[in-house]
Regions:
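Amphipathic alpha-helical "coupling" segments that flank catalytic cores
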Residues: 1-641
Length: 641
């Protein structure tokens, strides 16, 4: 058994951007693990460590050398490998080349099957780990794939930021590595302010402590320090809550080497600005964490995670307060300027905004949404007042896209429209619908809180889906530029929250609205859109552990109303399960199951009873899916039964 040592490979550079660094950590881990496996070196745990100025691989228990390997490989039959004069043929030369030996080194002998073959005897010597690690380390730096990399000086090598040092140790031995004229050593660099300059690392085991003494903490330590600081802030303000989106929090961890949690404030006047654009400005631009009070209202305070000398905390707070004041001044100006215009004015400006080159402007989209949202409201509620509210909300839903606030803070589309609608005196249902009509933005997201919002959301998403299919640009497995897949999942979730909507009818209505605006829509598009929804429903059914045969059977009959599709599929799966379990009492067992199911109507009980009385009539050659498809057609399930 070869002796083992720990291996340390640190790439030191100028400060790296946080988001690319986060992705590089996972990428670096794969490179290190695959490289060591391919090299033949045995190794233990691999840890990837990072700070804004370093990316590091720490590998436990790396063997000091590869094992010596003796191996015999069998090649082609001798009669094929050599000609009549005993000269090697192309077959022999190819086999020898593959094995890394000369054809003259091949031997001939009879194998266990009685035939004579050629053999290559391979003796692969042991290779020192230092040599292998030196080659691997150089290749790993070059192999890291950054969204944007750069060259510096007169060097051709690339990295996300200029490389300044390399600390590469195998035990106490320095592994020779050179990249962009930087040569490896046993030194690292500390914090720019708290521990500037080079610091010697005797062995990999000393690395963490050397960094700590030089004012640098590794990821988990930094995370713990930041969380502890935030808990102290919350404890000092009973009932308060610090908003820490995971993505921003991970970025902040990778922006500091010696984090310190500080609290800043902004002027009271900015609390009159919608809290969403205040928090977006702080989180997206400055990576500050807003603080909310016990009632969930935004306060004037925010958290800054500093990487500076702790003795300079007051100056750091003052500097960050000046930065946030400037940003919030802009947000306040945009909001107040927008309030000088009505949403109807903004809505007319949508004529200049392209929705999709072949599908016209956003104004045309809102006109289609108005008609479709009103139809959806009437289908669901039979209430003309609800239909008028839905049409009004759809008319104004996209108006804020041309507002100054949304141009600056794009993720607040809809939200700002809701504020402007309230300020203009629109009904609360309309304002809420405008604010929430983009929901659900992803699988599992909240639905709009009110009916009007759901009607507008369905109209918006269905209009996009039908339009993209109408111009023959449907999503593919690798491309979905218009987020059709996400829109379809949203429509399914929204329709499931209603009682009376017919998705097939709504698809037809949406396509007809495009025709009325002059778009030529092929008759086959209706079927294409329906099949797309069936595909999404099949995926949902699969996630709900419904059998593949049942999904196939229900898909075959063209059901696209979500609840009906899923309930039919569940019923087919469970009924077949019960009929298999109680073959000797088919009618009673299935009827017992059906009686216990809250999803299935009395009509279905009778249908299944009749079918199972005649089950002997089914030929054995009939496939399961064709049989269940037939049965599924006869079902009357769910709220429409």
């Amino acid at each position: 058994m070869a002796e083992v040592r720990d291996f340390l490979f640190e790439i030191g550079s100028e400060e790296m951007p946080s988001a690319p660094l986060q992705k590089a950590i996972a990428q670096f881990n794969k490179l290190v693990v695959s490289g060591l496996k391919d090299s033949g070196l045995s190794f233990g745990e691999v840890k990837i460590l990072s700070t804004p100025r370093r990316l590091n691989a720490y590998v436990k228990d790396v063997a000091e050398a590869t094992e010596e390997i003796s191996e015999v490989k069998r090649g082609p039959k001798a009669e094929i490998a050599f000609d009549a004069e005993g000269n090697p043929t192309k077959a022999a030369e190819g086999f020898a080349r593959k094995c890394g030996v000369n054809a003259d080194a091949l031997t001939r002998r009879v194998d266990t099957d009685g035939h004579e073959y050629v053999f290559a005897e391979l003796n692969i010597p042991s290779v020192p780990a230092t040599k292998i690690l030196s080659e691997l380390a150089t290749s790993w730096i070059a192999a890291l794939d950054w969204p944007r990399s750069q060259r510096w000086g007169s060097f051709h090598e690339r990295y996300v930021r200029p490389v300044r040092w390399l600390c590469v140790l195998f035990g106490s031995e320095i592994v020779p590595v050179t990249y962009a004229d930087v040569t490896s050593s046993n030194t690292t660099q500390g914090h720019r302010v708290l521990g500037p300059g080079y610091h010697e690392v005797a062995t990999p085991a000393d690395y963490e402590q050397v960094l700590k003494n030089a004012g640098v903490l590794l990821q988990e330590q930094r995370k713990d320090v930041i969380l502890a600081g935030i808990k102290e802030v919350e404890a000092a303000r009973p009932g308060s809550h610090v908003d820490m989106p995971e993505k921003v929090f991970e970025e902040v961890i990778n922006l500091t080497e010696w984090p310190q949690v500080l609290v800043g404030t902004f002027d009271e006047e900015f609390l009159n600005v919608p809290s969403e654009i205040i928090t977006e400005s702080m989180l997206s631009n400055q990576r500050y964490f807003p603080i909310y009070d016990a009632e969930g209202k935004l306060t004037r305070e925010f958290i800054v995670v500093s990487n500076a000398d702790p003795s300079c905390a007051e100056r750091v707070i003052d500097g960050n307060e000046r930065v946030v004041r400037a940003r919030l001044d802009d947000a306040k100006f945009f909001f107040e300027e927008d309030l000088k215009h009505t949403l109807d004015e903004f809505a007319q400006r949508l004529e200049t905004v392209v929705f999709q080159e072949k599908l016209g402007t956003v104004l045309q989209k809102t006109q289609r949404m108005e008609a479709l949202a009103a139809e959806i409201a009437l289908d669901e509620t039979s209430n003309k007042e609800e239909a008028e509210l839905a049409a009004r909300a759809a008319h104004l839903a996209k108006a804020d896209l041309v507002s100054q606030a949304v141009v600056e803070f794009t993720s607040q589309q809809g939200v700002m429209g809701g504020y402007y609608a309230e300020a203009a005196g629109e009904k609360s249902d309309v304002a809420a619908a405008i604010r929430e009509h983009y929901r659900p933005r992803f699988a599992g997201d909240e639905l709009p809180s009110g009916q009007i919002g759901r009607f507008v959301a369905i109209a918006d998403k269905l209009d996009t889906i039908c339009g993209i299919f109408a111009i023959n640009e449907p999503p593919t497995g690798s491309s979905d530029p218009y987020a059709v897949r996400r829109a379809a999942i949203g429509v399914i979730a929204l329709v499931r929250s209603t009682a009376n909507l017919d998705l097939k009818k709504l698809i037809a209505s949406s396509l007809e609205l495009y025709r009325q605006q002059g778009l030529v829509v092929d008759e086959s598009v209706q079927s294409q859109v329906e099949q797309y929804f069936i595909g999404r429903l099949a995926s949902i059914a699969k996630d709900e552990k419904i059998s593949a045969d049942a999904i196939e059977a229900v898909s075959a009959i063209g059901v696209i109303n979500p609840d009906e599709f899923l309930q039919r599929a569940h019923a087919v799966t469970l009924s077949v399960k019960y009929s298999e379990r109680y073959k000797h009492l088919p009618n009673l067992s299935v009827l017992y199951f059906l009686r216990e199911s809250t999803l299935i109507s009395a009509t279905l009980l009778n249908t299944w009873a009749n079918l199972f009385k005649r089950r002997k009539r089914f030929r054995r050659t009939v496939s399961f899916s064709s049989m269940t498809s037939t049965l599924s057609k006869k079902m009357s399930i769910g709220s429409r039964s």
